Every structure is written in C-alpha cells, then in structure tokens.
C-alpha cells in the first residue's frame, strides 16, 4: 500500500515527492508541510507502539481536506445562473481523506483554515463549502508563490467569501442594475425596429457594479487611472454607467446627429459600439481617470494595444511601482479561448520591457459564442484555463449574485495592487437576446433560450432579495425604475434639441498639439557635425571595465572613424546617429523586435555584451547625464501582440520615437490585423494619430519566398487620405532623415520603411557626412551620374536595392542614355518632385518602372496609376520586372540570378540594341497568343515585350515580364 493512499490519488505522487524532500531536509518545505509530515511520522511511531492513535491520521486528513477544497472547490460551486448543477467531485469525498460521515461530529480543530469553526468536522466542512462552493469558485492553489496563496485565503476564509453589505451599499448596487437593465430596454424600445445594433448586456448586468467596484475601490487604493479595452458586448452600457458617457451623446450617435470634434477634421467614423471614450469621474472622494480604447470587431485585438498605452503612461508619469495606472480588459468567453493574441498578450505580462504591473481581466462568460456552445469552442472546463500559464488567480462568479461579483472585484483589485500580477474574473451569465437584436437565437439554441425566457432577470432576483431582507420596499424598487427611465427620456429630448459634440481629444491630452495635420511634411532634419561627433563618440564608448567582443571593438572603432572622416557611414552607423541626435534633443526612444539588440543581420550592435562576463551595456543610453531613456528590447517570438503593444505605446505618447522591427519583412503578415485595423485605419475611424515606425527588411537576394518580401503592395493598397507613409530609403543618410522627420514634425503618421539587407554592407550605398549635415530628406533622388540630361532617352524609376543592381550593370556595360531615379517615398506620392524630374529629361521618350518583385506585387500597380498622368507626350510607360507570381520569390538561387540578369538586361539594353520596330515585332509575337491582348494593343492599352533570349527553358524566360503602356489621354 502506498503510504499516502489516504490522500487524493491525483496528489499522492506529488505528496510522496514532498515527503522525500522532507526526509532529506525538513527546512526545505514550508511550515505547513513540515507539520503535515511530522504528524504523519508521529502517527506511525505510535502505531508501531503499544496503542493506536487516530489523532494524527485525522489531523493529516483534515489538512488535506482543507487543501483540496481550496484547490477543487470551484468544481462544485454554483456558478451557472441557468441552474445547471455541477456534480459532486469524487476527490472531495470524505473517504479520500480517511474519514467518514460517522466522524462529522468529532472535534478535529481547523488546522490552517482561517475561518471561524466550532471545531467539529461537520462545521469545518460546512465552512469550506460556504467559502469555496457557493456562488464564487476560486482557482489559486496552482500559484507557486506561497505569500499570494496565503493572502487570498486570509481574505476569503474569515468571511466565508461573503462580506456583509450595508443597506446603503445594497440599494446603490440595485440602482446600478436597474439603470443597466432599463438602458437596454430603452435602446430596444426606441431603436430596436431600425436595425441598429446595440449588442445588449442583458443577462450580464452584474458587470456594471463589478466594474464600478474596481473603479471605486481602486481609487481608494491609490489608482489614478484605469485604461480599458473591451469588445462590443455590453460596451454601450459600460460607456454610460462606468465611464459616465452622457446618455444624450450615445443617443445622438444612434440618431447620427452628433457633431464631430472640430480639432480632428473629418474621417470615415465608426459604429457606436467601437468608439472610445475617456472621462474623469468621482470615486471615493477623489477623481479617477478612465479611458476605453476604440477597437475593431476583431475580438481581443485591442488587448496588447491597451497594455502598450498603459506602459507608456506609466513611463511618462513616473509610475515606477506600476500601481497608479492599471489596465482592465473585458473579454468574451469564446474569444478568450479562441484568439491566439490572448496567449501572446498574457505572455508579455511578465516580460521586463512590456509588463504593466498586472492586468485585471473580466470575462463576460455568457456560455455561447454567437451560435457556438462551449463544448464546440474549447475542451477545457473554463475559458480562463489559458491564464494558468501565468499563475493568475481566477475568480469564477455567478452573475446572478451581484454581491458576489462585487466582492470578487474587490479581491481582484486588491490582489493586483498588492502583488502586481494579472488576475481573472470569470462572470458566468447568459445572453438574453441573440448575438445582436435582430438575431434569432432559438434557431441554434432552442433549449437554452426556452430556459432563458423563463428565467428572471438579475435585477428582479436581487430586488426580491433586498425586499425580503427589509432593505427596500417594492415601492422603492419601482421608484428607482421610474427615475432611470425619466433620465433616459430627458436625455433623448436633449439629444434632439442640442446636438452634442464628440470629444476625441479627451482620450489623451498629450495629443492636443498634434491633432491637425499641417501642410509642411518635410521640416529641417539636418544636424551639425559637432552633434554627430558627440553622438559617435558616446555611442562607441564603453566603460573601462567592459570588454566587448574583439570584432565588435573593431566595428565601434570603424564607426567613430567614419564619422570623423566623413566617409563610409554605413546603415548601422546612420541609425545610431539618428537615435543619438534625437536623444540629445530630448526625445525618448524605444526600439523593439526580434533580435533587435544585435540586429538580424548583425548590423546594429546597439546593446553590447561583455566578452568575459556577459554583462550588457547600451552606449546610446549613456551619451550624457539626464538624457531621456532609450529602450532597445529583444521581443518574444511574436509579431501580432508585440506590434499591437508598440502601436499602443506610440499612441499614448507622441513625444517618443517608437520603432518595431520585423526579423524579416516577410513575417509582418503575422500582424496583418493590427496593420489593417489600427495602423492604417485608426485615424480615419477614430481620429487617432500614431507615429509608430515599422522597419521591414525587404529585398530580393535569392533567399527564397519567406526572406525576400515585406508585402510592399499591401501597404500601398492601404494608403489613402494621407493615413501613413511608405518609404524605401536607399542610403543611411536618407534613413537618418526619415527617423528624425518622424519626430521633428508637429503631427504624427505611421511610417512603414522597407529596409535593406544586402545594402547593409554595400559600400556604394554608404553616406558622406555632408548628407547628414547639409541636407534633409529627399523624396526622390535624381541620377547623379548624368552630365547631359538631353541625351537621356529612357528614365528608369525604381526604389530600393534594384537601383544599385541597375547602376552597377549600367556602368559595367557602359550604357548611355539611361537615367536611373530612386523614389524614396512612395506614399504620400511625391508628385511635385517627380514632375520636376521628368521636366529635366525633356528628350526621354520612354519612362519605366523597374522592380525586383513580381508584377502583382511590389509598387508597380501603385506607381502605374500615379505615373501615367504625369507622362509628357509622346512618352510611354513601361514595366520591367518579374512576371506575376503566386509565390513572392523563387527558392532557387540560380533561378533568382537568371531572373535578375534578364530583368536588368531588358531595363538597360533593349532601347539601345534593338529598334522600335523590333520591339513591336516582339510584342506582336506575344500578343498573338491571345485575342484579348490583340484587342488591348488595338485600343492602345497594353503592349507586352517578350524576354530576350537567355540560356534558360521557355518557362524560365517567361518569369520576367516587360510591359509597355501608352499614356492615358485626359
């Protein structure tokens, strides 16, 4: 027989392991387990002697009984408002602890139970069930920190998890429920027939007093600001009853009569249940600021954004203890389980560069996801099980017990403030209506909704309870309802008479000077040579007791020498000068991404590691005393949550330069939802600017389809209304000016940078000191090698690495009459600059766009639309690049080289080695293959040139497309 068979079988092996540790060294265990095993051994000694004692085994059984109820009591708690009883748990049977019902009246004491008992097993069992098996079930015994476990037990067990509520508190709680219920009824009554969705909170009204408890009790604990994120379910009620958004403003949004904020201009706007809001509201005799971030319908996507906002605010408000600004996230049960970004965001919670001191999570567990029941959406008992990975305490609460919800909220808030850890509130409730007000839920859940239809509302249940307790009369309840209805009716009249105005600026006062976009996009960004020397000296200096890697020491020396001589300033050096100069000017810097401290391509080396000890040193953080902070952080291996966090960080404080770098640009599509919903569209939807910089390594070098391409075409397709900038710098100095421009302007736009890989070590791309001190950003770089512009017959526009490939080939082949122009900023499209370039080449009859990417990718379609209208007569527009392809790039290096040779050969040689008649002949041969192309030729719309003969199979030759296009007539 196993020596611990009288324990829970599930725990026997674990206890056996602890016992082995006890035998080696009793002090290695905490006091509870020491006493446990001491009693066990004492019992064994007496059993071997003259008499048998039942006291020691009983004591051990009692201790394990208490432990098991703490660990497993939630499994039999009454959590479901719809009354689906949970069966008794076999591991809580008395026989598991070596006891029986015949011993219920024995005096067993209470071991380490903190609650009051009369000493009998019966009373202890009743108190354990009252604490852990009523309408609150708690999961906290998996927490490794003993202090956290004891703190929770000491606050739950003495009051049996059921604090007393005064008459005043109970009435206030009831009125919150009534206001929430009547609000939903009012919206349905007035607008329910107009197909306007509200995503009602009905069935989960208890979250209103729960959230207000977090706010009020948090204020009493010293919390100054709560930053919230939540989806659509119940959002309007939370705005009205937690953030105190005026009813008349919400009603005006239903009527679509609300006036826009004049400080933010136009925009497309968004549906009312996506909009954000911020307000200062009274709480515990003081004011607390609450903000609710705007969010899309993409569930849980706002989570890392809110965390980034909180971290930025904690930084600039010097909340080092992270106890004054708190994140609060409201989730749905199905989404919390189903969306991977939840896991990613939880993983960020304890990482040094991203932790916010703990998030209060509230799950509106209405036991359904649109039409999907829990058993089809997860395999775990609870939606919160994913949170066990961060050892967060989890409070499961019955939503029909609003007092239990408030009590759990108080515990959760206090725990977060005490231990700076995440905490979970899982409110079991139901959804009285369908997914939206037009949805017919009984189509898919007929049994559930038959039960819901008969079930009284939470408000009615609680009102009857208070009436029975004598805390209020039925007339008092009716009066509360009357007051709530009158307030809403009055607010609707006010909304009709006086159109309220949106308050976008209230979301963050730091943006008050950045809300209007000025006409000037390109301020001065040059820096004096003295400043550059100061940066170079400081950023290459290490302490006397620090030993860098020998090769790194050489790199640092070369960087400083390049700045001093003014020649050969490479990309890592140019970035260092940009960041250092901004730091000296007072701009905080944050650079985040996978492997950014060294750089994926070993080009940055911004964080140095001592060769002997591994100690880290950041030269840019030590340029001078009292400089602003710089954080250069290797992120976890995730794109979506990390990018969302950095977006949130940048949105909270426009004074920071915030940069996120992808390991390769190809992986950026792992964060596509953040890009689509926030980076590209937030200004238009919610009038929120953002200055985030995205660094996306991009370039075709034969490395295959996942290491070549940063989805340039997708970013350009998202561009409209000056919503962001898309650039591809071709020199370190251009990169330098782009970063500085991002901060020097008086407005903020996201900056998407296609960054080089091959060019990082290409000396032809390096910059001179004059490029930093005498110039600012050039949106377009003209060809510096053309002495006689009238001799140019063809102008090749391009962007990025392909410029250097073309230039090297042109020089090698001594090609004349071809100018190569770099477009550094693709969007906003530099129309004026390109018009100026075209005016210089008056004799050019062919204007071309050249790109590495396939025809259906890259910038071709974007540039085609913009260049066509700028062509002078009789010039034609031509495309040189790879043909359309399903995959971004070939995985075969030889194929890549052949494609590149063919592409460059066409772009540089065809106009000079073949006559126009020969070109036309080739185009006819191609077009003869399909009737539509012949028609296109007759209509003057499209001409395709066959590739030059190469030593490749026909299908290889076809991998490069050369297309001419006549200028469209106005």
Predicted regions and their residues:
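Conserved phosphate-handling catalytic cores of large alpha/beta enzymes
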Residues: 369-380, 388-424, 428-434
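Cofactor-binding active-site loop characterized by glycine-rich and histidine/acidic residues
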Residues: 224-391, 395, 601-653
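Active-site cores of enzymes that catalyze phosphoryl transfer or operate on phosphate-rich substrates
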Residues: 162-180, 184-187, 256-307, 311-318, ...
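Flexible, glycine-rich loop/tail regions that form catalytic "lids" or insertion modules at the edges
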Residues: 57-67, 74-106, 181, 246, ...
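Subset of Sec-pathway N-terminal targeting signals
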Residues: 1-40
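Extended, charge-enriched "interface" segments that sit outside catalytic cores
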Residues: 40-206, 223
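Long, low-complexity, intrinsically disordered segments
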Residues: 937-970
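Active-site pocket-lining segments that scaffold enzyme catalytic pockets across diverse folds
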Residues: 187-248, 554-561, 569-583, 587-588
């Amino acid at each position: 027989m196993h020596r611990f068979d009288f324990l829970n079988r599930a725990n026997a092996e674990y206890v056996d392991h602890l016992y082995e540790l006890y035998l080696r060294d009793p002090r290695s265990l905490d006091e509870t387990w020491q006493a446990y095993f001491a009693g066990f051994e004492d019992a064994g000694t007496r059993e071997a002697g003259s008499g048998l004692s039942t006291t020691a085994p009983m004591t051990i059984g009692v201790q394990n009984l208490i432990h098991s109820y703490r660990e497993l009591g939630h499994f039999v708690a009454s959590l479901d408002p719809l009354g689906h009883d949970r069966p008794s748990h076999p591991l809580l049977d008395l026989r598991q602890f070596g006891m029986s019902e015949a011993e219920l009246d024995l005096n067993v004491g209470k071991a380490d139970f903190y609650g009051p008992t009369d000493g009998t097993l019966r009373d202890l069992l009743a108190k354990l069930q009252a604490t852990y098996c009523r309408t609150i079930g708690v999961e906290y015994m998996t927490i490794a920190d003993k202090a956290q476990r004891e703190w929770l037990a000491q606050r739950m067990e003495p009051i049996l998890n059921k604090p007393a509520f005064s008459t005043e508190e109970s009435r206030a709680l009831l009125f919150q429920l009534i206001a929430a219920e009547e609000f939903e009824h009012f919206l349905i009554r007035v607008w329910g027939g107009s197909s306007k969705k509200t995503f009602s909170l009905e069935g989960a009204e208890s979250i209103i007093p729960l959230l207000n408890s977090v706010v009020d009790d948090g204020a009493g604990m010293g919390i100054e600001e709560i930053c919230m994120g939540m989806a659509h379910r119940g959002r309007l009620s939370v705005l009205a009853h937690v953030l105190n958004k005026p009813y008349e403003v919400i009603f005006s949004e239903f009527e679509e009569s609300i006036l826009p904020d004049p400080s933010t201009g136009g925009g497309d706007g968004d549906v009312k249940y996506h909009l954000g809001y911020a307000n200062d509201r009274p709480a515990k005799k003081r004011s607390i600021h609450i903000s609710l971030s705007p969010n899309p319908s993409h569930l849980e996507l706002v989570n890392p954004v809110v965390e980034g906002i909180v971290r930025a605010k904690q930084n600039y408000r010097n909340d080092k203890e992270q106890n004054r600004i708190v994140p609060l996230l409201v989730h749905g049960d199905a989404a919390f389980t189903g969306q991977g970004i939840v896991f990613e965001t939880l993983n960020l919670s304890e990482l040094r560069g991203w932790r916010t001191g703990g998030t209060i999570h509230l799950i509106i567990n209405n036991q359904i996801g649109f039409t999907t029941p829990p058993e089809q959406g997860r395999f775990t008992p609870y939606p919160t099980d994913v949170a066990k990975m961060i050892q967060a305490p989890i409070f499961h609460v019955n939503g029909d017990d609003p007092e239990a919800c408030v009590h759990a909220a108080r515990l959760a808030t206090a725990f977060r403030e005490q231990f700076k850890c995440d905490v979970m509130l899982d409110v079991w409730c139901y959804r009285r209506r369908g997914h939206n007000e037009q949805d017919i839920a009984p189509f898919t859940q007929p049994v559930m909704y038959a039960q819901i239809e008969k079930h009284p509302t939470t408000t009615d249940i609680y009102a009857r309870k208070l009436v029975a307790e004598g805390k209020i009369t039925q007339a008092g309840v009716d009066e509360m309802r009357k007051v709530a209805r009158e307030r809403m009716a009055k607010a609707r009249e006010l909304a009709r008479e006086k159109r309220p105005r949106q308050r976008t600026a209230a979301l963050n006062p730091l943006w008050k000077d950045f809300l209007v976009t000025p006409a000037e996009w390109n301020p001065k960004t040059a820096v004096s040579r003295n400043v550059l020397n100061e940066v170079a000296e400081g950023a290459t200096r290490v302490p006397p007791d620090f030993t860098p890697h020998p090769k790194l020491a050489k790199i640092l020396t070369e960087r400083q020498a390049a700045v001093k001589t003014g020649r050969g300033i490479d990309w890592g050096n140019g970035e260092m000068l940009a960041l250092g100069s901004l730091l000296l000017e007072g701009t905080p810097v944050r650079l985040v991404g996978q492997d950014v401290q060294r750089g994926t391509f070993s080009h940055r080396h911004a964080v140095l590691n001592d060769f002997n000890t591994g100690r880290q040193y950041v030269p840019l953080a030590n340029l001078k005393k009292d400089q602003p902070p710089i954080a250069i952080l290797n992120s976890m291996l995730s794109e979506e949550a990390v990018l969302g966090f950095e977006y949130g960080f940048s949105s909270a404080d426009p004074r920071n330069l915030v940069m996120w770098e992808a390991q390769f640009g190809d992986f950026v599509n792992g964060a596509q939802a953040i890009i689509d919903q926030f980076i590209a569209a937030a200004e238009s939807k919610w009038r929120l600017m953002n200055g985030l910089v995205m660094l996306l390594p991009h370039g075709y070098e034969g490395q295959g389809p996942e290491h070549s391409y940063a989805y340039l075409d997708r970013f350009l397709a998202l561009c409209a209304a000056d919503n962001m900038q898309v650039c591809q710098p071709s020199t370190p100095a251009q990169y330098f000016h782009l970063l500085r421009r991002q901060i020097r302007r008086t407005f903020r736009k996201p900056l998407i940078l296609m960054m080089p890989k091959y060019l990082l070590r290409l000396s032809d791309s390096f910059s001179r000191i004059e490029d930093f001190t005498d110039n600012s950003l050039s949106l377009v770089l003209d060809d510096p090698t053309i002495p006689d512009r009238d001799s140019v017959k063809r102008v090749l526009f391009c962007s990025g690495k392909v410029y250097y490939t073309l230039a090297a080939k042109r020089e090698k082949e001594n090609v004349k009459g071809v100018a190569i122009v770099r477009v550094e900023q693709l969007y906003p499209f530099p129309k004026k600059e390109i018009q100026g370039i075209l005016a210089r080449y008056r004799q050019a009859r062919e204007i071309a766009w050249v790109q590495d990417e396939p025809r259906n990718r890259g910038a071709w379609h974007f540039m085609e639309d913009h260049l066509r209208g700028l062509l002078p007569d009789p010039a034609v527009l031509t495309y040189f690049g790879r043909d359309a392809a399903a995959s971004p790039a070939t995985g075969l290096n030889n194929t890549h080289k052949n494609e590149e040779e063919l592409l460059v050969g066409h772009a540089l040689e065809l106009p000079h080695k073949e006559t126009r008649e020969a070109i036309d002949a080739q185009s006819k041969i191609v077009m003869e293959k399909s009737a539509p192309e012949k028609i296109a030729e007759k209509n003057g719309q499209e001409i395709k040139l066959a590739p030059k003969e190469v030593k490749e199979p026909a299908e290889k030759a076809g991998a490069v497309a050369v297309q001419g296009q006549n200028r469209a007539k106005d």
